[in-house]
Every structure is written in structure tokens, then in C-alpha cells.
Curated annotation (Swiss-Prot):
EC number: 3.2.2.23, 4.2.99.18
Subunit structure: Monomer.
Disulphide bonds in the chain: none
Protein function: Involved in base excision repair of DNA damaged by oxidation or by mutagenic agents. Acts as a DNA glycosylase that recognizes and removes damaged bases. Has a preference for oxidized purines, such as 7,8-dihydro-8-oxoguanine (8-oxoG). Has AP (apurinic/apyrimidinic) lyase activity and introduces nicks in the DNA strand. Cleaves the DNA backbone by beta-delta elimination to generate a single-strand break at the site of the removed base with both 3'- and 5'-phosphates.
UniProt gene name: mutM
Taxonomic lineage from the root: Bacteria, Bacillati, Bacillota, Bacilli, Lactobacillales
Protein name per Swiss-Prot or TrEMBL: Formamidopyrimidine-DNA glycosylase
Keyword Lyase: yes
UniProt keywords, alphabetically: DNA damage, DNA repair, DNA-binding, Glycosidase, Hydrolase, Lyase, Metal-binding, Multifunctional enzyme, Zinc, Zinc-finger
Annotated GO MF terms: 8-oxo-7,8-dihydroguanine DNA N-glycosylase activity; class I DNA-(apurinic or apyrimidinic site) endonuclease activity; damaged DNA binding; zinc ion binding
Co-factor binding comment: Binds 1 zinc ion per subunit.
Originating organism: Streptococcus thermophilus (strain ATCC BAA-250 / LMG 18311)
Amino acid sequence: MPELPEVETVRRGLEKLLLGRTILSLEVKVPKMIKTSYDSFLHDLPGQTIQAMRRRGKYLIFDFGQLIIISHLRMEGKYLLFTDQVPDNKHFHLFFKLDDGSTLVYQDVRKFGTFDLLDRKQEEAYFTRKKLGPEPTKKTFKYVPFERALMHSGKSIKPLLLEQKLVAGLGNIYVDEVLWAAKVHPETPANKLSKAAMKRVHDQTIAILQLGIAKGGSTIRTYRNALGEDGTMQNYLQVYGKTGQPCPRCASMIVKIKLGGRGTHLCPHCQKR
């Protein structure tokens, strides 16, 4: 699943390609992906001009001024821009014909992606219902509320971080990296962490997600940015996908366990419970 760095990289690519472009027509081959009114999606979007490309957590936001599309890529979603003919592909599901003759295509092997067409005034309420936490920046991700939330939760730290309520954007790759960097075992109950460990988790969340953005995201399986380029963050991963390899910090073997149904990578020496 694309995580915050990958979605931010897609946003930046789409911004370069789409800003100022007007939708002339569209085709939707998988109506179930449209989570708001299907008829409104088809009838209200033609004539709309893309004024901004924004992001909230793992959600992309196409901003038309009064209207917005909130797009969630889920497991395998990606956007492709074709300047002339669109090739046949059974995994191409949404087609936006643009005023310069190009076509923006949404591709999704799993068909899990979602689209919500909303009035911009509904955006805040939408994300409030999602209980989405703050963005992982020094300005928005404050330590004191984070510490307070951890102290009041007996959940294991990894599943808790993946809920998106404490901070937006962490997924399976980056949470493993954050907890390795913070020297915290993923199964540790949040309220059993020392305050020093809580602070390390907080600070490493910001540092690693920002590094992921700087490196254009991680190309692990099928991820590409909107320009068709691979990310490079996979070259900087310390623990994710490194089962059986030596820990970069202590040379113990990285192991993989199951936690909450997810493959979880850790160093048993550096990340003791």
C-alpha cells in the first residue's frame, strides 16, 4: 500500500502534470470505486479545472475550487497520463479526458481504490469522521498530545500507530523503520514505553517519513510516481524486507514476525520487549 511518502510523491508529480487542466469528459468502468453519488461524479466533473493538488495523510485531493475529489490509492492504485492514445489494459478503471488532449488514467489491479466527490466545505468533516491524526511534521505533530495518547493505551505500539489516529501516514513499511530507529519492539504496549522511548518514536516518525518524501518513496513492488519513475527510499530501509540480514546497528539477524496479521520486521537484540 502506498504510504505517506509515496502519496506525497504522487501528488507532486500530478501537480506538475495537471495544474490548470480542465476535465472535458470521463469514463468510469468500476462504479463501486465511487463512494459518493455516481451520477454526480459523472455529471459534475466535466468543465471543472484542477486548481491544486493536495494531500491529507494517505489521501490525494484534487481541488477544483468549490468541488474536490478525495482519492485513496489503497493497495495498488496509481495514476498514469497519456498524451495520445490510451493502450488497452484490463486494470485501467477511470479515464479523465483533459483539455490539452491528454488522458489521466487510474489503474488499480485490486480495484480497492476509492473516490469521493465533495463540496470543499465538507472536507474537514470528512477527515474528522476518519479520525485522521496530524501530519508528521514538527509544526503539526506535537509531542505532548502524542505522549498522553500513548500513556492511555494498552495496545501494542505498531498496530496503534497504524490506526492513523495519532499521526497520519504510517503504513507497514515505515512503521517498522520508525520502531527500529527508536529501538522499540513492535509488540510493546504503548503505555509500557518509557518517556524516552515515546520521544524517540515521535521524533523518528517525523524524520523517517520526511526522508521517505525526500527520496521519492519506496519502490518495493509496483509503486511508481505519477511521472512513471521509481522511488529510491528502498535503498535507505534498515529493517523492512531484510529478514535474515544483519542489523545495521548491532549485526544481529533481522527477523520477521506476524503482528495483527501483518508481517513485521525487527532486530531482536536492539528492539527488546
